[in-house]
Amino acid sequence: MNPQIQPQARYILPSFIEHSSFGIKESNPYNKLFEERIIFLGVQVDDASANDIMAQLLVLESLDPDRDITMYINSPGGGFTSLMAIYDTMQYVRADIQTVCLGQAASAAAVLLAAGTPGKRMALPNARVLIHQPSLQGVIQGQFSDLEIQAAEIERMRTLMETTLARHTGKDAATIRKDTDRDKILTAEEAKDYGIIDTVLEYRKLSAQTA
């Protein structure tokens, strides 16, 4: 298996052999996608996956800053700081970033889906998008002054998440706050109406049959 990209697999990742004029090499689906400028976020958003995604974004930009990068997303979400690290890198690189939701983009992953280049944010017909307010992981304990600090941090994260979603959806921050007070689950069409994506993709097979 090619050691260059090691996703957080929960099963044995299939590998295959490729023959070329340069010889024989062993590859896997993630490396093959990377060669096509495709990043696949298929795990929880945490420090490890964020570092992997950021590294791939920066490498692909250095290889060709004028070609689009595609990010496929099927993720339950994750930590806020990891989310913002990926988000900032997406905004930092010069290449346009297409985002495509396969399966689900929940919580932090929904923000990344919305953060793609305008006009290039997509989802498959049965994809699910979930947005809600951020939270701190674990039980909050400590002195009262520490609890105040934690409460202020939660409010800061919530405000930042609301303004970020507002920037990319066209909604105002007050609407985002109201909608994310509890879990808000959207179908692909509803996510399009909300401004999180621009297009609900058709199945390629059906498109070919009707062409």
UniProtKB/Swiss-Prot annotation:
Compartment(s) where it occurs, according to its Swiss-Prot or TrEMBL record: Cytoplasm
Assigned keywords, A-Z: Cytoplasm, Hydrolase, Protease, Serine protease
InterPro entries reported for this sequence: ClpP, ClpP/crotonase-like_dom_sf, ClpP/TepA, ClpP_His_AS, ClpP_Ser_AS
An annotated GO BP: protein quality control for misfolded or incompletely synthesized proteins
Domain of life, per lineage: Bacteria
Catalytic residue positions: S107, H132
Function statement: Cleaves peptides in various proteins in a process that requires ATP hydrolysis. Has a chymotrypsin-like activity. Plays a major role in the degradation of misfolded proteins.
Family per record: Belongs to the peptidase S14 family.
Subunit structure: Fourteen ClpP subunits assemble into 2 heptameric rings which stack back to back to give a disk-like structure with a central cavity, resembling the structure of eukaryotic proteasomes.
Identification of the protein by name: ATP-dependent Clp protease proteolytic subunit 1
Protein source organism: Mycolicibacterium paratuberculosis (strain ATCC BAA-968 / K-10)
Upper taxonomic lineage: Bacteria, Bacillati, Actinomycetota, Actinomycetes, Mycobacteriales
Name of the gene this protein is made from: clpP1
